[in-house]
């Protein structure tokens, strides 16, 4: 970044310039290899960062205090450097950077262990992979930091800015950082998808999130790994631009979760168990924004924010994921208290309707009883209502059923073939996204495209179980069908009206349906009514 590389450049301290020494003796620590010699004139060049900033000398207690005093010009430059609140204070020393790296490692390792040992609600494979790679990333950073500090100590100095510069220029760390941040940003998309309830909103969040994540990481990789031959404005603007893009994405992520908190504030306030977790989530999702504000006020914090960037992503993923788990448990308990259960949305209703879950199939009327049913005015009213519902269901099935779609195989019209191609592409894309949402992101739905894990007993065991004749039948206990005496005739009437043959051509459309739970509802209607 432009200001990251330029903020150290300024006035050159006097101790970093070549110092002319008068006649004297030259003493080396390796006196066996380099014996003591007498020189008439010498030029001394002190180790400095970017040839302008003095560094911490590790030989002060060994050489200077024992054999000689420091040069006056060196002591004066060090006092001037440490008095500078921007560069030489303790907050920007190598000690604070070591503490920052150590704290980051502890936080990431703790959250990784928390994710891997969470047996109540198992996290997705994407979250597990991201946290494990984050652990590998911080482990590489710690090992590389130890090697760099060991080299500095061997050369007789310690400097935090040089440590950060070498860490940022180390390609293996940059490659792992690219992969880890990409996966963690996709995890943020996963959490946003868990907030939305409609499948249409989840698909849109998946599409927009994946595109934004890939675009930001590609630009970041270009800014990190591509060095233009000629220095121009693009080489300075691109790193700053991608930095602002990451901050904007983090702000959008935090804003979406905040809006969801506000919309569910009554449920949150009614459950004291998630108060602390909600407050912690609300604070931690804004940590990248806090680092950005600190960066604007003080440019050096950007160096520390690069160390904490992966930590911010891990915290911003694991804590909201756990909050979503707790909140979903509360919502499931609330839905169990009601009769209707969870709500269905329009896109789910149309998808469920092609499985004919909401279609009341009418028995074919016998020719002998045709006049008898038409004599009763009540039956006429019920028949009209049932006819209207049957027309509506037939209309829905006609638009969604694969058997009623026109066959354009022999149609040579380019427009029809193009429309058919678009339809097939759309169906394939929706199937792919639904598989990713259900399998990869561990976001279950009421209706899934796979029934491999669903077990049940089949009707007509003696017949051949072909692909289009399988029907999963849940096991019901006999006690569920016990009705009061007064409502027995109502049950018989409803069963006669809603009975349907089990061997229909639409049975194959009732496959691929998950039944997560069922609730027994008994309507006690007296015989007088």
Curated annotation (Swiss-Prot):
The protein's name in its UniProt record = pH-response regulator protein palH/RIM21
Its domain of life reads Eukaryota
According to its record, how does it sit in the membrane? Answer: Multi-pass membrane protein
Q: Which Pfam families match?
A: PalH
Location(s), subcellular: Membrane
Any ranges marked Extracellular in the topology annotation, and which?
Answer: 1-96, 152-172, 226-241, 295-298
Listed under GO biological process in this entry are: cellular response to alkaline pH; cellular response to lithium ion; cellular response to neutral pH; cellular response to pH; filamentous growth; filamentous growth of a population of unicellular organisms in response to neutral pH
**Organism, scientific name:** Candida albicans (strain SC5314 / ATCC MYA-2876) (Yeast)
Any one of the GO CC terms: plasma membrane
- Role played: Required for the proteolytic cleavage of the transcription factor RIM101 in response to alkaline ambient pH.
- Biased region (Polar residues) positions are 398-417
Parts of the chain that traverse the membrane: 97-117, 131-151, 173-193, 205-225, 242-262, 274-294, 299-319
Record keywords: Transmembrane included?
yes
Residue ranges that the UniProt entry lists as topological domain Cytoplasmic: 118-130, 194-204, 263-273, 320-529
Keywords (alphabetical) are:
Membrane, Transmembrane, Transmembrane helix
PANTHER family noted in UniProt: PH-RESPONSE REGULATOR PROTEIN PALH/RIM21, PH-RESPONSE REGULATOR PROTEIN PALH_RIM21
Q: Which gene encodes it?
A: RIM21
């Amino acid at each position: 970044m432009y200001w990251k590389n330029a903020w150290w450049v300024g006035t050159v301290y006097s101790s970093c310039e070549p110092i002319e020494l008068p006649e004297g003796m030259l003493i080396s620590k390796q006196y066996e290899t380099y014996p003591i010699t007498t020189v008439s004139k010498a030029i001394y060049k002190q180790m400095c960062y970017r040839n302008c900033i003095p560094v911490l000398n590790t030989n002060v207690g060994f050489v200077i205090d024992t054999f000689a005093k420091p040069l006056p010009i060196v002591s004066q430059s060090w006092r001037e450097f440490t008095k500078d609140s921007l560069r030489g204070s303790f907050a920007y020393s190598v000690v604070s950077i070591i503490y920052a790296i150590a704290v980051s490692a502890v936080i990431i390792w703790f959250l990784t262990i928390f994710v891997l040992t969470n047996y109540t609600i198992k996290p997705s494979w994407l979250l597990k992979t991201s946290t494990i790679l984050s652990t590998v990333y911080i482990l590489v950073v710690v090992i590389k930091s130890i090697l760099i500090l060991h080299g500095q100590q061997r050369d007789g100095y310690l400097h935090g800015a040089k440590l950060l510069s070498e860490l940022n220029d180390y390609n293996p760390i940059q490659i792992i950082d690219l992969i880890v941040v990409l996966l963690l940003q996709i995890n943020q998309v996963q959490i946003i998808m868990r907030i939305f309830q409609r499948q249409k909103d989840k698909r849109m969040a998946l599409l927009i999130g994946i595109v934004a994540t890939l675009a930001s990481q590609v630009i970041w990789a270009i800014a990190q790994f591509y060095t233009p031959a000629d220095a121009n404005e693009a080489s300075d603007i691109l790193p700053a631009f991608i930095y602002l893009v990451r901050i904007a994405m983090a702000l959008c992520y935090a804003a979406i979760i905040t809006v969801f908190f506000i919309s569910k504030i009554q449920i949150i306030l009614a459950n004291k168990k998630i108060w602390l977790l909600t407050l912690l989530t609300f604070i931690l999702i804004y940590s990248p924004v806090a680092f950005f504000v600190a960066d604007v006020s003080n440019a050096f914090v950007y160096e520390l924010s690069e160390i904490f960037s992966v930590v911010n992503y891990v915290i911003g993923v694991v804590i909201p994921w756990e909050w979503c788990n707790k909140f979903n448990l509360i919502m499931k308990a609330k839905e169990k208290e009601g009769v209707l259960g969870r709500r269905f949305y329009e896109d789910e209703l149309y998808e469920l309707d092609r499985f004919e879950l909401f279609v009341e199939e009418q028995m074919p009327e016998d020719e002998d009883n045709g006049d008898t049913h038409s004599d009763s005015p009540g039956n006429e009213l019920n028949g009209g209502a049932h006819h209207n519902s049957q027309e509506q269901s037939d209309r829905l099935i006609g638009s969604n059923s694969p058997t009623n779609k026109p066959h354009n195989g022999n149609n040579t019209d380019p427009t029809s073939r193009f429309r058919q191609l678009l339809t097939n592409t759309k169906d394939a894309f929706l199937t792919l996204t639904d598989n990713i949402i259900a399998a990869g992101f561990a976001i279950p739905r009421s209706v899934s495209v796979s029934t491999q894990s669903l077990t049940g007993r089949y009707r007509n065991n003696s017949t051949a179980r072909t692909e289009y004749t399988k029907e999963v039948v849940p096991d019901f206990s006999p006690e569920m069908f016990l009705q009061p005496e007064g409502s027995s005739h109502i049950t018989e009437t409803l069963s006669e009206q809603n009975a349907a043959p089990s061997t229909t051509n639409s049975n194959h459309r009732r496959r691929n349906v998950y039944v997560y739970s069922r609730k027994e509802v008994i309507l006690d209607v007296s015989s007088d009514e």
